[in-house]
Amino acid sequence: MWKLVNGRLIQTADETRSRYKTRISATIIEQLKQLSIQHHSHIGYLLENGYINMLQQGMITYDKKNRPKDRIEFRTTCDAELLEQLRDFAKRQQLNLNDVIEASVAYINVEDVKDAHYRYRVEKG
């Protein structure tokens, strides 16, 4: 992101975001890639939107027997507070974080997803 300080633009890292690594289905990642292209966004923003909507619901149903077999490592960033809330939610639901992340894909609202250029926003410093 950029900050406007004394009339000058200064590039800074967004300190509210946290990097994380997880293992999710390759099929889901491919679907998210296509969705992000269609809606001019990033996979991380799509997932973040799904997390928010799922947490607002407060509960999910997940069958551990139907876990995907094609999980691969995936790295992205997310709002740090949101990621912590997601981890707590996974513990309360007695699920792995990977399972909760995959379930959140069903809660993505593409009308409310951040644009790909959000990371280049200008904030007043």
Predicted regions and their residues:
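A detector of short terminal or domain-flanking linear segments
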Residues: 1-70, 77-81, 88-125
